[in-house]
């Protein structure tokens, strides 16, 4: 299957909000288009491996202007609607406006989709209609990484209006517009790329038309104040700079590491991106494991060489050379692993894979919940890009039709695949058994090293007593020094080995993995049994089981990532 940039790469999604009645006299129109195009150009230049996608409801004014600039640049756009298409077209004032809308719809990357909203199938009342516009504004705010606002900079109390949507972005979407309201969650906030624009109905503007600023929340102030700073998308002052960088790194890794790899045969972005994330996670997991093993071996050699150099046999000063070489090799491995973020990338991409997998099966059975609302929301800031990336993939899949039979099969396939991974095809040779075996193996080596150290220490005590009582047992007087130094040398070697095995065990986390994997094995076994034994209709049973399993899998994987973040690749401790 050939690559599709919007299915095989994480996109940067650009949203738009703005006035419908823009003053588009020729000089204003030109400067607004130039400013919007400059944002697109900067994103395309700074993130060359990352596709751009515009979300625009194609309302009159700002929505259409930005869509036209995107189309001229070859940037695809999709059209989320606040209500069914026929009802939405009624809001356009003239036949020319409706024709312009239809023309832009034809050029969209996919047909328009109506966002989920609490409305009946009938034409909504005026108050409900305003709420629908607020809902689509909230959808764009939550789905986009870059929000462009063509706004005059003046506040106005209008539900679903431009100023309202900007408030959503800077201070968080109100609870009534969230699919999963929670008083405990931090509000999801972000910057607004504000281009000052004039309105026909009100010529006042806060700044000159075309003036560009980035609007961000000012945490130092109380109330609903925000700062206006003059930066560009991706600059260090942009709160989403790390998000853009991580998305670009993922796409660059895909191009570099998986070049020529066939894509998964599906039209689902979450499924195809999950497969990509799994391959990249495995690649970096192998590199991180190799780095840790090399550090272990190099540190062991360095410790042994130093012990020999400082040991009982004289004139072995040349052993300082392999000691320094082994130590230097360990430092090189450490620097390369940390500069390349091998372990962090393995963890990030594995977390991304799990989240995308859960999102895919949720979507498949019609659970239009977003993993981004549940996943890593209260974890470290450096992980925030993962749920945002999953949210982008979820947005891409909103266009897909619902297929009940596929959804039921997808749930069973997911549960069976996860159970087989943890338990093994025969229930004996899965990840749980492998990690438990590794824990036992290295635990035994650690114990034997400690026991050897104890035996050598006891031998040293016996030697000291015997040498004090009857030194003639050891022959020539110089032999006493050799016996003493030799036993001290062996004690040191045993201590180094015990410390290395202990450090390696802690950093690989075999014992903790085995414990967690045992719990996951039980969960997936029970989930499959619940699916088989449920008296509910198949679709309802699948939804019920996968909703609960998905939440548990996300919580467990979030804990797994945090556990490994606390155990970075470091030079192993031998003392």
PLM features: residue spans?
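Conserved non-transmembrane functional hotspots
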Residues: 221-451, 458-575
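Acidic/glycine-enriched connector segments
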Residues: 1-216
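Small-side-chain structural scaffolding
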Residues: 15-17, 56-62, 67-70, 108-109, ...
